[in-house]
Amino acid sequence: RLPSGTSQWLWQGAGLPTSVALSGELPAGSELLVRYRSAEPSAGTLPVTVQRTLYRLEPLSDGSGFSAVALKSGDELQSNALYVDEFILTPEQQQVYRFGLLEAALPPGASVEPSTWGIQVAGLDGNETPVSFSRAQYEEGELSYRVPVPELNGPLTVRQLLRFAERGRFNLPASRYFRMYQPADKALTEAGQLQQWQVE
């Protein structure tokens, strides 16, 4: 069982199945839906670097806002803290991509903080004094959020505020930037490898 209480079925046989057979008769009008996520790493095909960094927001002693502390790979996340999720998209020189989408993978229980009103943050852009936090437009997805990128013609920084409500150890697929009308053209975080996040 997953921490959320739902069941997870893992294939135990040797090799991968090529078909699925059901025993018994199904009632008329029955429908079967099979969903799966491949654990096989995907390869990026677009010459764009996608870098993801998480920052924990720690309150400043004078109460004027927060200080952003960059986390390293493997650092534990706290369910009672607020985080900045930062992506930097960098295309190769002279390359321009239009109508793209950034899809950020999230673990169960994670959500984008919908309001950033009144939040002042120091340390994201080298600033020592807190400045108003501004986030990109986004839309919620299934265990993800998406940010439209109308045009990518140079380094672009995208940030959101995140909270984590569910504790556990989660394997996240790579986040990706892809072209809306050529979805096979994509760039991935961490060379497409799974990332493990621990939420306490």
Task: State where each predicted segment sits.
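Long, domain-scale non-catalytic interaction/scaffolding regions in large secretory-pathway
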Residues: 1-200
